[in-house]
């Protein structure tokens, strides 16, 4: 029998072709712009805006990235001197005072601080690590026109008056294996341009502005911590930190302190970011930190963290250079920095002022936690977390009540077909009923949701087992596999269900299920908002709001149906006539009809015999419907159909509007794509290459599977109307991408595997071991390719969550033979032990280095570094003692004097010997000259094109000598 359908001439009808085309077009119309926004950086303007010079900025970036410039390198000193020169050039190039007068301003006072005096000893919280660091920071202070003219910082007891200023920070050191273009060269040149901008007439700041070029960020955020010891650090109450956790692309707002300090970022021409990234940082999904934690956590400032985030494969490698970034990326960070800083320095309120604090931190006040996100990289939304909480609670209460009231109204109007299997004619005593089949479709949703989602989760485990790093280079192959599998299975399951039990209520029941599921998620999100201050679930509110409206429309749609009693009466009329003519309004096809015995003319029933049908009481009328027990009316699937009825759905569905589904789809799918789509892309970019850092690979695949469900779950109410074309195409896509994801090599020249290098030398014996850490077995394969490993036994052990493969390396030449003929002369130390107390004094120096450390076999109780400053905001000893003391100096060949104290009973409990024991280690990090670290040169030369090299620790070469007292 032919399967009738609604008129194909209606372009908005709920029929296969309109549903397929409209849903596909809407998804493409939103997904494509999201991808473009995520991957394409807005072009820099053809001419520089007033107060900026992009040509200068690009030239500065090229000069800055001329070589590796970690703190412990001679190139770092060159960068320091170059920065001072450039800063003075920019200040000298400021217009004369007369030009400021023409716009009603005064030329601002500018003070440059070259801090070569500050130092600090501090500890890593709970890590058993102590650090002594000497500053080479550069600070530029542009006095605000609202500030007084006193030079308060020259008074040892001086304090800034008036409202707090603004700090903009970038670090000018790089890692020893990266040129530092985006980490943090773009931030540095942005700060240079801010000097130019805020010394231009018309841009003089209201509040004081401090531009900090800090040195030593890469080695435990040392530069930001020692900045706290300079008097100018008392001025700023707010800050903007410019960073790079990737290598190019867009600069994203990673995190911020509160809603008030975030609002100036709304001025950015191309805002980018989501509060969910801040929650991800707090959860430790990204295994790195920025100076933000020092300024906010240790100093008490309120501010923002803007950073590049991808690709992490280039982060801290030689591909973090000017060639792999662009002027567009420079402009994206610079424009955001200008807009945000201008908003902060022009603020006339007292919102960033607070009561004095007893802990010594800045009295910057406190603001409400914020919720923030961008919309297509063009607009930025900021509101307070308690607003989100209030909206969430309101919607949690109002939405169910609205549906409940609507359901009651439907019931009173006798139009509540949902959950109704039958209805009685109006004048019936209840013994005669007409089938409605209103329950059909209610139990489909769990299968529609669980089966596709379970398969995608299974795919996540499958890929993790056989090719866990494929997402490193082929993230969209993984996405394509997940999406194609999910959509095809959802379509297949829905088509099977629709074929077996067709229902006009598939849409309303699926939306009702979605409403219930999302209501539960909104409850969870609201609890986390209230209890833990987590705002990352903001998207649930908007998605739930759209689903609620779509569900409500489905309920309102039922008012278009006839009253159930009228409908049943109209169907029952033929059974009460002797005529063979009858109504077919109630015929619902797809039901099998069993013939029963005819009634006698007087309505009596023939006496039952052994030949009587077992279905006695079920009677076929002249109208071809059937009475079951109690005159239950049924239909015959051979009956002629209503012309506007779709398929074998219930006959009463012809009264339902045919276009409403479009409105429902537009209320659900676009909201999901707009709010969840950017989060999916952000999470993929931020985490897809973290497996090489030791993070669990399974997490990102599970996240992709879960996000696939979130992104495509709006299709479930409509997908049973899909034609077979797109699902079958997706089945082919799934087959191809599954094979590719299981067998393809996971790395490429554009997405290299990052390996971590270190060479450790025993200066007493001359024995050295070069090591590479990284993903196994690839790290072993790379080590085996090196000429120096031929014939050697490469040993691989687990270290710092990563396999570490070591071999006897080519001896380093970090100290020239003319300076020291023997390796043991590279490092000198002297230890003097107290005769009466468990104390000792160590004097340590290294040749051609300004970084050493002392590693103890057992934690010491206390230590003091000669001439060091101490600050109660930065405890210098961990609660469980100190096992390692890192020593940094601004001078080459410096001698550190360290006094240590250990437990009084240590001599009695030490099985290794009396007193104190451990290693003195010096670090060499300058890899700019070939032949200085030949083992590293060999790795760079012979490693495959799909592998890159980064540093494992602060030093590329670590030379050690043992001590015992």
UniProtKB/Swiss-Prot annotation:
Q: What cofactors does this protein use?
A: Zn(2+)
Sites binding Zn(2+) 2 sit at 183, 218, 316
Q: Where is this region: Disordered?
A: 577-610
The answer to whether UniProt assigns keyword Transmembrane to this entry is yes
Q: Which GO terms describe its biological process?
A: proteolysis
Cofactor: record remark: Binds 2 Zn(2+) ions per subunit.
- Site, as annotated: Transition state stabilizer: 315
Q: Which residues lie on this side of the membrane: Vacuolar?
A: 38-387, 463-472, 529-532, 683-698, 747-965
The UniProt entry's sequence similarity note says: Belongs to the peptidase M28 family.
The protein's name in its UniProt record: Vacuolar membrane protease
